[in-house]
Amino acid sequence: MQKRAIYPGTFDPITNGHIDIVTRATQMFDHVILAIAASPSKKPMFTLEERVALAQQATAHLGNVEVMGFSDLMANFARIQQANILIRGLRAVADFEYEMQLAHMNRHLMPQLESVFLMPSKEWSFISSSLVKEVARHQGDVTHFLPENVHQALMDKLK
């Protein structure tokens, strides 16, 4: 039986930290779904369609990654996708409490859904999409933190 995992997030935009996590997940699981949440309450900079397209381009080199958008509860989406593993990145202790709450709620909604936490590589442990956007808005150089296609799209958005 194939091990199908879902790596969910808003990915607004996808960063090299996200790419690091999904790349390592592909070595652990047969099929990884990069699930991009619509998240209208977060008022994303990029539309869902743009985020999906950017992530598809940024992960094209990973043969066992499928990118798709979703707007349902994660447990419902996982059930539909026949996946029982959630990948979550943990950057710092501050992430842990929130992620633990999500993991317990997801397990309540779908008892067979396991959350697997991956630490990003040290190089990416301090970045977030929000931080990268904030630095870019103030003309800071964020080239190192984003896939090339995403960096270009971000610069175009900020013009």
From Swiss-Prot:
Task: List the GO terms this entry assigns under cellular component, sorted alphabetically.
Answer: cytoplasm
Pfam families annotated for this entry? CTP_transf_like
Record: residues binding ATP: 10-11, 18, 89-91, 99, 124-130
| UniProt pathway | Cofactor biosynthesis; coenzyme A biosynthesis; CoA from (R)-pantothenate: step 4/5
Superkingdom of origin: Bacteria
Q: Which GO terms describe its biological process?
A: coenzyme A biosynthetic process
Which molecular function GO terms apply here? ATP binding; pantetheine-phosphate adenylyltransferase activity
Q: Which coarse location class describes where this protein primarily resides?
A: cytoplasm
Q: What does this protein do?
A: Reversibly transfers an adenylyl group from ATP to 4'-phosphopantetheine, yielding dephospho-CoA (dPCoA) and pyrophosphate.
Q: Which UniProt keywords apply?
A: ATP-binding, Coenzyme A biosynthesis, Cytoplasm, Magnesium, Nucleotide-binding, Nucleotidyltransferase, Transferase
Name of this chain's protein: Phosphopantetheine adenylyltransferase
Q: Does the keyword Magnesium apply?
A: yes
Indicate the quaternary assembly: Homohexamer.
Compartmental location: Cytoplasm
What is its cofactor?
Mg(2+)
Q: Where in the sequence is the signal peptide annotated?
A: none
Q: What EC number(s) does this enzyme carry?
A: 2.7.7.3
For this chain, the family text in UniProt reads: Belongs to the bacterial CoaD family.
